[in-house]
Swiss-Prot record:
Lineage, top ranks: Bacteria, Bacillati, Cyanobacteriota, Cyanophyceae, Acaryochloridales
Native organism: Thermosynechococcus vestitus (strain NIES-2133 / IAM M-273 / BP-1)
Superkingdom of origin organism: Bacteria
Family classification: Belongs to the RemA family.
InterPro entries: RemA-like
Alphabetized PANTHER family for the sequence: REGULATORY PROTEIN SSL2874-RELATED, REGULATORY PROTEIN TM_1690-RELATED
NCBIfam families xrefs: PRK04323.1
Pfam families listed in its UniProt record: RemA-like
Identification of the protein by name: Putative regulatory protein tsl2331
């Protein structure tokens, strides 16, 4: 399981991408996911720093930086 912050976890097998929320296409993706009830907000009211795209068109918002999530996903050396 991948800790995405604040005690929230996702299955790494379902993870397709970890992206920054700053670009316009990603913002549109978030809006569409919210409209279709495919959005999970795991930020606990904090600023969104990473958008996780899961299979099944599920979008997860995280307050952790993408680099932090990738480091947690990678096995230790």
């Amino acid at each position: 399981m991948l800790n995405i912050g604040f005690g929230n976890y996702i299955s790494p097998q379902r993870l397709l991408a970890i992206v920054s929320p700053d670009s316009a296409p990603i913002k549109r993706l978030i809006l569409e996911a919210r409209e279709h009830h495919h959005l999970i907000d795991a930020t606990h009211g904090r600023r969104t720093r990473a958008v996780l795209v899961l299979d099944g068109e599920i979008i997860v918002l995280s307050a952790l930086h993408p680099e932090t999530l990738v480091a947690r996903l990678s096995p230790p050396p």
